[in-house]
Curated annotation (Swiss-Prot):
ANK repeat residue numbers: 705-735, 739-768, 772-801, 805-834, 838-867, 908-938
Protein name according to UniProt: Cortactin-binding protein 2
Modified residues (Asymmetric dimethylarginine): R494
Compartments, as annotated in UniProt: Cytoplasm, Cell cortex; Cell projection, Dendritic spine
Keywords from the named record: ANK repeat, Cell projection, Coiled coil, Cytoplasm, Methylation, Phosphoprotein, Repeat, Synapse
Length: 1659
């Protein structure tokens, strides 16, 4: 110890120095405590105290931070080799006072602390080890349990082997039966052989007959061959005559053409002397063209825009490459040209067209076309022919410019020339330009300022640079043009400065707005120098031509972009549905194609069209650029004007036609004569190669002929040039060219409204006609320029003017489908009845092109009362909407045209209906057919009707056109209003509508009626919503209800009787029309005929069952019908009595029906008097009566059967004088009576089952039970409601997805679910028959009506019955002395709670569940149903084992066991004697379930319902045993998985609870599900012997095994086996169990025999 102490001394650094020195010296000696001095002992004591303090500090630090310190040390933050650092850190951190003594740094104390911690860790690990050992023990126990399960498995396997052995025995028995059956099969085979032998004999006989028949056929074929030979001879002769007729007709046509040619030659020679061409070049080219035309194989001579340096080639290949070319105009005075034109017109007319080609504004001079050129032209676009169809695809406007439909592309009118087009004009009202400014100077400045769209000298728009090098001549011309433009612009700038005194142009917006007017040729070309000037200034200078500017032109955009941009810039333009010109993408650069649809029409009358030059192939009506129109005096047109599109410059037949960009392709400059153009404007426009010398000479150049320029300006819409020309003196504004086209005509034809207004204001002749008789109004109407038409009408143009062919403006507008023009003309009062020389009317024209809108306007548009005053709103709105936006006009008004007008025939005898039918225009034909006066049987000159020439679609339309739609109805005769339940039966039902056509025969009509009836019977008796077309059946197959065509008594066509197969002299159609039959009525055979077909149809009870009931009455005489209230017992009995009466009367007996209604006061004495007075009971002394008597006793349930019928049972069963019965009369006398054989007794009971003493009566009658879940009641409601739906839909069966079908299915499911739930509750007296649901309203589109009806039914019928039934059941035991009535009047609180819970569950599970209404609407209607707000959590939380104090466990077991026995599940605890264990277990589970349900419900509901739940729980626990069973049954209904789930309906309501967990717990669900759950017959084991003896009537064991209600729940086989085993084990228990159930629930005992047949006691 001295050594240890010495070893400690050097570590005491905190001791004083003297003490340290003394300790060091003492270390040399042996350490002895006794030798220490007092000071040394003090020092030692202080050292030990310091060590204790250090240890305490270490312990506290380790306790406080044991986990953190060890974690830090583990991760290397502190080293275990030096724990002193940690101690020092903790000490310094914990002690803020520096004077505190440092901790002892003795390692022993530190190690002790570490060891203490290690001990703790060791203890913890030992505890974990102990836990692991316990888990090991549990694992071993589980292994033992697994072994036990394996043993059980082996036992089950052994049992399985036993079952297999039993199955083998069954198989052996089946094998024996198979052997027996095989023997029978051999016998049958032998019989079959005999039959086959007989069949062979019959076949031999038939073969002989066939041979004879074949011989007869051979003779008949020989006769037919002879007939065919004669017919072929006749055909040959007819064809020869036809060929001869055709030759004569062709010769006549040739002669007519020669006459026309001679006439036109004379006219042309006369005009030729008047016209003096001023240029020599046209004559020169005219001669060239004559040569080219006369050669039939040459291609059309063309000038192409794309040709910049080369001369025009005269090959057809060039035509193929350049789609925008034009044939050279032939000489107007040449007979050869006229002949060629005539031939071409004949070529162009399609064979189906029944007009001549002259009828559509088509001229007479046309160049001939070689076939090769035609073929190549077709390659450029989807052209349908060489020329447009004048009657179908082309506007009948002079020149066939642009077809209104997409049948012909825009290139066709150029390359394939129909007769020349006569330029059509459009008038303008006022034109005021600057009067102070010289129009010539203004026009010149307007012209010479560059424009991006102007063509260069080769006709190319300079938007696209040429794709190849420009020739030297072209370059020279380019320089010359630039120089000319610069010079003239400078020279004219003096005259065109702003003038202060110039009046403003009214309504003219700045013309520099390129986006509005450059719709035609400007795409992507940015205009340079667009100047916006004030309205008082002259027109602004257009942009310079890119060809003349110093900036290079942008590249040529793609064609698609051109079309789109022109369409995008089309502001204020109205499309007229014209052809979209779509040339191929390989167009030469510089060519342009315009869509007429996209052309703008100026919105202001004074607004001149913006210059745009790229008008290559535009259809008629295009805006021609102002720039182009100023280039007067250029090369002449290549073709007559009307053969070109209306907007092309060459459309005017003038010697010096305006040259414009690509429609006329000028020859290269080298081929032009210097003197070809002598006009300054022409020279400056860049078209003449001699531009530079003329400009340098400084002399003025004279302008060309003013009338020619006037027409050019009008045709191309150049308002500026037109104003300049109109201001000159001496100008003839009515001058006509050689084709008769005036300036007004050209402007109107091309749709230039401003030009038309200017010309009309200048007093141009508004009705000036061309050589074919077409006026400007004709041209504007044909082209669809409705603004021009409106102007011309306003200037009193002749709206009924007829051209040479008789075409009026209305006819031309109808021909081209221009509905705006048609509307304007009709409102102006034009005559619709004017006919052409071919006999065509405007209706013919509209129908010929298939234009429905035009036809509707002609037939229905009425002339407004305000006459010719048109407002903008009226012109836009019209009388009705033709675009389909509104109702069809024919639906609102009657046609305004007469029948004669509609039926008018043309020269060939064709009416408009003929044309529409032959071309397949079904819509047009349908509109014509809506006119009541249309004669579809009208025949043409070939004796063909409209039907004969119609296409298949139109034939179908015509066949159904005059078809009579007559409803077919089924009548069941008169039903007595007093009949029970007959208020809901309809006497007549419409089953379908028959279409009777003119060609319908009586055989077809008979088949249609029979098939319609059979289909209807099949449809209403099918299981689903099958349409009449889906029902495939024939007349011989009966429907499920037994009705067929054999059930018909008679058929009336209107008021005329008719039978199937009967024929009249007239056809069915004529017969119906003559007799004005509005319906066909089928009467079914009824009781008056001794049949029950009408009863079957009225009540939907199958005919076979009704016949069985009638047979029972006839055979047994005493029959009682019973079933739930509303099962139609009284109706069935009355109809059977009526049928029986008529059968007896037909057999020669007199018969009488006596009916008595039984009530509570009906006594046996009254019944006796009834029998005696009706001669059913006759005295023994009296002889039998031959009269038949039928007694009906209704409402027998209101009286006691045993008391009422007890004395009559014996004589009723033994009807003879040998077994009399003595009855005492009212006077006290007694006499013997007996029932005779001619008396029939029928009764009705509105009860589902008999009980008590009434069962004594059962064996003396034949009973017919009308069960709700068996036929006929089960399917009656479904069939009845389906028939009601069919009647509501006029014979059509709606699809299953229709809301009406859904609401009807819901009503049907409500009835079934309601009865199912009531049966489960053990209240059969509350069951409902289908009678209450027959009045279910069927209102398509109004499902709410049905829901409201259901709420009234629930509140008025169902709720009182359920309350009464539950109260009567719950009060049977509780108040035996007071009786049921007292209990019903004063129900206890527990009974009230049970009733409310039952109503709430029934409402949610049976009624509201499955309602097709949306959830929001259903919530609104929920308040209409009474009893739906009861908190269902009370039912779920009800303590199933709560009982009164005086009750024992055995008593409860006796009460509930029978109901459990009839259930599907049986508790394993039944086999145990200790019931308290079961009760505790069930109680615990019930409380657990309640808690889980409470957790699912809302907190607010819990707070509100806690007290209510507790109070009602106590009340329920005070109730009777039946109440407890009712509540258990309610719990099982709530938790049942197969029943409808309440949570789906009312999970959002606060007062409803979920019950899902009840079914999830196996023990609890078994406990509540096995209560009163019905089972099907196959699943229930036979009842034990003591149960059988307790039944009221002796029935076999198997009969009693039938359950009350069919279960909708799946039954596991293991549970059924378990049930049977438990039944056997409990069979030795006392009989009190069955006695209890029989005494307290008689109706339940009756329900056990539900599926039993009614006739068993008497069998």
């Amino acid at each position: 110890m001295a050594t240890d102490g010495a070893s400690c001394e050097p570590d005491l650094s905190r001791a004083p120095e003297d003490a340290a020195g003394a300790a060091a010296e003492a270390a040399k000696k042996e350490f002895d405590v006794d030798t220490l001095s007092k000071s040394e002992l003090r020092m030692l004591l202080s050292v030990m105290e310091g060590e204790l303090e250090a240890r305490d500090l270490v312990i506290e630090a380790l306790r406080a931070r044991r986990k953190e310190v060890f974690i830090q040390e583990r991760y290397g933050r502190f080293n275990l080799n030096d724990p002193f650092l940690a101690l020092q850190r903790d000490y310094e951190a914990g002690a803020g006072d520096k004077e505190k003594k440092p901790v002892c740094t003795n390692p022993l104390s530190i190690l002790e602390a570490v060891m203490a911690h290690c001990r703790k860790m060791q203890e913890r690990m030992s505890a974990q080890l102990a836990a692991a050992e316990s888990r090991q023990k549990k694992l071993e126990m589980e292994k033992l349990q697994l072994q036990a399960l394996e043993q059980e498995h082996k036992k089950l396997a052994a049992r399985l082997e036993e079952e297999r052995g039993k199955n083998k025995q069954v198989v052996l028995m089946l094998v024996k039966e198979c052997k027996q059956l095989s023997g029978k099969v051999i016998e049958e085979a032998q019989k079959l052989e005999d039959v086959m032998a007989k069949l062979e004999e019959e076949k031999k006989k038939t073969n002989e007959l066939e041979e004879e028949l074949s011989a007869e056929k051979q003779r008949s074929t020989e006769m037919e061959a002879q007939m065919e030979k004669q017919l072929s001879e006749f055909d040959t002769e007819r064809e020869q005559l036809r060929a001869k007729l055709n030759r004569e007709e062709a010769h006549t046509t040739d002669l007519k053409e020669e006459i026309d040619k001679m006439k036109k030659m004379i006219e042309q020679l006369k005009r030729g002397s008047d016209s003096k061409p001023s240029l020599s070049l046209p004559r020169k080219t005219k001669d060239r063209r004559l040569v080219s035309i006369s050669v039939g194989t040459e291609g059309t001579v063309t000038r192409s825009v794309a040709c910049q340096t080369d001369l025009v080639t005269e090959s057809a290949d060039h035509v193929k490459k350049l789609p925008l070319t034009m044939p050279v105009k032939p000489s107007t005075g040449s007979p050869l040209a006229s002949a060629n034109a005539k031939g071409s017109a004949a070529m162009a007319r399609p064979g189906i067209d029944r007009q001549t080609s002259h009828g559509d504004l088509i001229g007479v001079s046309v160049p001939a076309f070689p076939p090769s050129s035609a073929n190549r032209i077709e390659e450029n676009g989807p052209s349908t022919g060489l020329t447009p169809d004048p009657t179908s695809s082309t506007p009948p406007l002079p020149g066939n410019a642009a077809p209104p439909t997409a049948q012909t592309p825009g290139i066709t009118p150029q390359n394939s020339q129909a007769p020349p087009m006569h330029s059509l004009h459009s008038p303008c009202a006022n034109a005021s330009l600057h009067p102070g400014l010289n129009p010539r100077i203004q026009a010149a400045r307007f012209r010479f300022q560059g424009n991006a769209n102007d063509p260069d000298q080769n006709g190319n728009t300079t938007q696209s640079p040429p794709s190849r090098d420009v020739s030297p001549t072209s370059r020279d011309n380019l320089v010359a043009k630039q120089l000319a433009r610069n010079t003239v612009t400078q020279a004219l700038s003096r005259f065109t400065g702003p003038q202060a005194g110039a009046p403003p142009r009214p309504g003219a917006p700045p013309t520099g707005d390129v986006s509005t007017h450059h719709s035609v040729g400007r795409t992507g070309v940015k205009t340079h120098g667009v100047a916006r000037v004030d309205r008082g200034n002259p027109p602004p200078i257009p942009p310079k031509k890119p060809g003349l500017s110093q900036t290079p032109s942008p590249p040529h955009p793609q064609l698609k972009v051109i079309i789109d941009s022109s369409r995008a810039s089309n502001t204020g333009a109205k499309g007229d549905n014209k052809t979209v010109a779509s040339p191929p993408s390989s167009l030469p650069q510089g060519n342009r194609v315009i869509n007429e649809e996209n052309l703008p029409k100026s919105s202001s009358p004074q607004l001149p069209p913006k210059p745009s030059i790229d008008l290559t192939v535009a259809p008629a009506g295009c805006t021609v650029s102002a720039l182009a129109t100023s280039q007067v005096g250029a090369w002449p047109a290549a073709t007559p004007g009307l053969n070109q599109p209306a907007c092309s410059g060459s459309s005017l037949a003038i010697p010096t036609t305006i040259a414009f960009c690509s429609s006329i392709n000028p020859v290269s400059a080298s081929s032009c004569r210097p003197g070809a153009s002598d006009s300054l404007l022409v020279t400056a426009s860049g078209w003449s190669p001699s531009l530079t010398p003329l400009l340098m000479s400084g002399g003025p150049a004279p302008l060309a002929g003013r009338p020619t320029l006037l027409q050019q300006a009008a045709a191309q819409g150049n308002v500026t040039l037109l104003l300049m020309l109109l201001n000159e003196e001496g100008l003839d504004i009515n001058y006509s060219c050689e084709d008769g086209h005036s300036a007004l005509y050209s402007a109107a034809k091309n749709g230039h409204t401003d030009c038309v207004r200017l010309l009309l204001s200048a007093e141009a002749q508004v009705n000036a006609a061309d050589k074919n008789g077409f006026t400007p109004l004709c041209a504007a109407a044909a082209q669809g320029h409705f603004e021009c038409v409106e102007l011309l009408i306003a200037y009193d143009a002749n709206i009924n003017h007829a051209a040479d062919g008789g075409q009026t403006p209305l006819y031309l507008a109808c021909k081209n489908g221009n509905k705006e023009c048609i509307k304007l003309l009709l409102e102006a009062g034009t005559d619709r009845n004017v006919k052409t020389t071919d006999g065509w009317t405007p209706v013919h024209a509209a129908v010929d092109t298939g234009n429905v809108d035009s036809l509707k306007l002609l037939m229905y548009h009425r002339v407004p009362a305000h006459g010719n005053s048109f407002s903008e709103e009226e012109s836009e709105s019209g009388v009705f909407d033709l675009d389909g936006g509104g109702e069809s006009p024919e639906g609102k008004s009657k046609p305004v045209v007469t029948a004669d007008f509609i039926n008018h025939a043309n020269r060939e005898g064709w009416t408009a209906a003929h044309i529409a039918a032959s071309k397949g225009f079904k819509n047009c034909l349908e509109i014509l057919c809506r006119h009541g006066g249309l004669e579809t049987e009208r025949r043409d000159k070939c004796n063909r009707t409209v039907h004969d020439v119609a296409t298949d679609d139109c034939k179908h339309l015509l066949e159904n056109l005059n078809a009579l739609k007559i409803p077919l109805r089924i009548s069941v005769g008169e039903i007595e209003p007093s009949n029970y339940g007959s208020d809901d039966f309809e006497c007549e039902n419409t089953i379908c509508t028959l279409n009777i056509r003119k060609q319908t025969s009586w055989d077809d009509f008979s088949k249609a009626v029979s098939q319609a009836l059979t289909n209807h019977f099949q449809a209403i008796s099918s299981d689903g919503w099958w349409s009449l077309e889906d029902v495939t059946c024939n007349n011989s197959t009966d429907s499920n209800i037994g009705l067929s065509s054999r059930s018909i008594r008679s058929i009336t066509l209107g008021n005329v009787p008719w039978s199937v197969g009967q024929s009249f002299l007239q056809s069915p159609w004529d017969f119906m029309m003559k007799n004005k039959a509005e319906h066909i009525t089928v009467l079914l055979s009824g009781p008056q005929e001794g049949c029950l077909s009408s009863v079957t149809y009225a009540s939907m009870i199958p005919l076979q069952m009704m016949q069985n009931y009638l047979r029972l009455v006839e055979q047994y005489h005493n029959v009682i019908f019973h079933g739930p209230e509303g099962s139609l017992q009284d109706y069935i009995v009355r109809q059977l009595a009526l049928c029986l009466k008529h059968r007896q009367m037909a057999a020669g007996f007199s018969c009488e029906i006596v009916r008595a209604e039984v009530d509570a006061g009906f006594s046996k004495k009254q019944l006796l008097d009834l029998f005696i007075s009706s001669a059913c009971l006759i005295p023994v002394k009296q002889s039998p009566v031959k009269k038949k008597i039928i007694i009906i006793l209704e409402n027998l349930e209101k009286s006691s059967l045993s008391e009422l019928l007890r004395d009559f049972l014996a004589p009723l069963e033994n009807r003879s004088a040998e077994s009399p019965c003595t009855f005492q009369k009212g006077n006290g006398m007694s006499e013997c009576y007996y029932f005779h054989e001619n008396c029939f007794l029928m009764g009705t009971i509105a009860k589902a089952c008999l009980q008590g003493s009434d069962l004594l009566v059962q064996q003396h009658f034949r009973w017919v039970q009308l069960r709700w879940d068996g036929e006929p009641m089960q399917g009656l409601l479904q069939r009845f409601l389906r028939r009601k739906v069919v009647n509501k839909f006029r014979g059509q069966v709606p699809p299953p997805c229709d809301p009406v079908c859904k609401i009807v299915d819901w009503a049907l499911s409500v009835w079934r679910q309601l009865n199912s739930c009531l049966a489960r509750l053990g209240t059969p007296e509350a069951l409902l028959g289908p009678k209450y649901f027959l009045s279910c309203p069927v209102v398509p589109g109004h499902a709410q009506v049905t829901v409201k009806w259901m709420s009234k039914l629930w509140n008025g019928v169902i709720t009182p019955r359920v309350q009464e039934a539950i109260l009567s059941r719950a009060s049977v035991k509780r108040q035996p002395g007071l009786g049921q009535t007292t209990a019903k009047r004063h129900p206890s609180q527990g009974q009230q709670a049970v009733v409310k819970a039952a109503l709430s569950i029934l409402l949610n599970k049976a009624v509201l569940h499955g309602c097709p209404l949306p959830r929001a609407e259903l919530e609104q209607h929920r308040a209409d149903f009474k009893g739906g707000s009861f908190p269902l959590s009370i039912v779920a939380s009800y303590n199933s084992c709560s009982k009164k104090k005086g009750e024992s466990g055995a008593w409860r077991k006796v009460n509930t066991s029978p109901r459990r026995k009839s259930g599907r599940f049986s508790l394993p605890t039944w086999n145990k004697p200790d019931l308290s264990t079961e009760g505790i277990k069930s109680k615990t589970l019930s409380q657990l379930n309640c808690n889980r349900n409470a957790s699912l419900s809302k907190q607010k509901s819990l707070e509100n319902d806690v007290s209510l739940t507790l109070n009602l729980d106590q009340r329920l626990s005070l109730g009777s045993d039946d109440e407890a069973d009712l509540v258990k049954e309610l719990q099982s209904m709530c938790s049942s998985k197969s029943e409808s789930d309440i949570s789906k309906i009312a999970d959002s309501r606060d007062d409803l609870r979920m019950f899902d967990s009840a079914g999830n717990n196996p023990v609890f669900s078994a406990a509540i599900n096995n209560l009163r759950m019905p089972v099907s017959q196959k699943e229930v084991c036979p009842l034990s012997s003591h149960q059988t003896t307790e039944c009221s009537n002796s029935k076999s064991k198997t009969e009693l095994g039938v359950s009350r209600v069919k279960s909708f729940l799946p039954v596991p086989r293991s549970k059924v086996t378990q049930c049977s085993q438990n039944t056997k084990r409990n069979s030795s228990s006392s009989n009190t169990r069955q006695i209890e159930i029989n005494n307290n629930s008689k109706e339940e005992n009756w329900n056990l025999h539900k599926n039993e047949h009614l006739e068993k006691p008497n069998k």
